[in-house]
Amino acid sequence: MKKFVSMLLALVMVFALCACGSKTEGGDKAESKIKVGFICLHDENSTYDKNFIDAAKAACKNAGLSEDQYIIKTNIPEGQECYNAAAELVDAGCNVVFADSFGHEDFMIQAAKEFKDVQFCHATGTKAHTEKLSNYHNAFASIYEGRYLAGVAAGLKLNEMIENGDITAEEAKMGYVGAFPYAEVKSGYTSFFLGARSVCPSVTMEVTFTSSWYDEALEKEAANKLINNGCVLISQHADSMGAPTACETAGVPNVSYNGSTVAACPNTFIVSSRIDWTPFFVYAINCVASGEDIGYDWTGTLATGSVVLTDVNEQAAAAGTAEKIAEVMKALEDGSVKVFDTATFTVNGETVTTYLADVDDLGDYVGETEAISDGVFLESFYRSAPYFDLDIDGITNLDA
C-alpha cells in the first residue's frame, strides 16, 4: 500500500494552488468552487465525533474556506441515513464528502458509485483498496503508536502505586472498556497493554464491551464492573464521558481517548491519545482543489502529526511520565521500538511467527495476507485501518 507521507508534508507546509484566490489568515484560499461535507455518527457530546469535527473546522480554516463552503451533518446513523446525508451534501454542492464511523462505509460506497464526480472519503474504513473506485478513499492513522505511549503512562502509574504500597505487583490489573470486539478496538487495547507492560512487567488487563460506540450509561456501568473486579486503572475505546466520570467518582486513575478529560476529572485523568484528522482533510481538500488524485488508502503517523497525545496531567500521573513518553516516542519514530514486536507477546503460550490477517475484508473473515515480517506484526501497513485481531496472553475478555 502506497504511503503518502511525503506528499502530505509538502501540502501541509506549502498550500499554493493554481487559480487560488486572495490570501487569508489561514493560508491561501482554495478555489471558490470547493465545498466540503462532513458526516458524523454523533455530535460534539461524543469525544470521537468532537475530535473529528474540530479537525474538520481546522482543515477548512487552513484551506481558506469560508463558513458557507463546508457543511457538517451530525447524528447520522450507520444505515441508509448515511447515504441520504451524502446525497443531500452532493445536492448542496459539495464536491468532497467525509464520513467518520466504521458502519458508514457501505453507504459511502453506494454514494460514490452514484455520484461519480464527487470524492468520498471514509475514516476507519477497509474497502477502498478492493473496491478501487476512483472517487472512494479510506483513511486512518497509526493510533496504535499513540495507544502504546498512553500505555507507557499507565504502566508508570501502576509502578508508582506498587512503590507506594497501594497495590502489590500481582494486583497491577487494568480494565478496558471497549465498544465492539473489532480489529480496530483489539489493536488499540493490545497496543495500550503492551505499552504498559513495557514498563510494568506484572500488569494484566481485563476487557469488557458495550456493543455501542457511544452510550454513557453502559460505559459507566462497564467501568464500574471492572473497578469492582479489582482493576486499579481504567482506559477505554468508547466515546462518552461514562468511563472517565466513573473513575473520578471512584478515585481510580484513567487514561482516556480522543481528548483531555482533565476539566471534569482533574484527580484521575492521566493522558489521552487521539487521531488528528486535520492532515488528511487538508491533503484531500487540496487534492480536489488542484485536480490531483486522492490515494485509495491513506495512513497518518506520528511524523505527519496525525497521532498525538494530550498534555500529561501532572496531578494524577506518575513523576517523569512526560519525559518517558518523549523518550519512547522518539524510539517509535526512529524504529528502535516496534509496538507489535512478536518477541514481546505470546498467544496461548507460544510466540507467533506467522499470521494471515483479514486485510481485504471480503466479508468471509478469512485471512489472506501474511502480516508478520522479521518478527513484527505490520499493523496499518497493507491497509490503513487496523487488522491486528490476535488475543494475546495477559489480556482477559470478560465477555468471551
Residue ranges and their predicted role:
Residues 12-13, 129:
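Alpha-helical transmembrane segments and their juxtamembrane interfaces
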Residues 23-400:
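A residue-level marker of the well-folded mature domains of exported/periplasmic proteins
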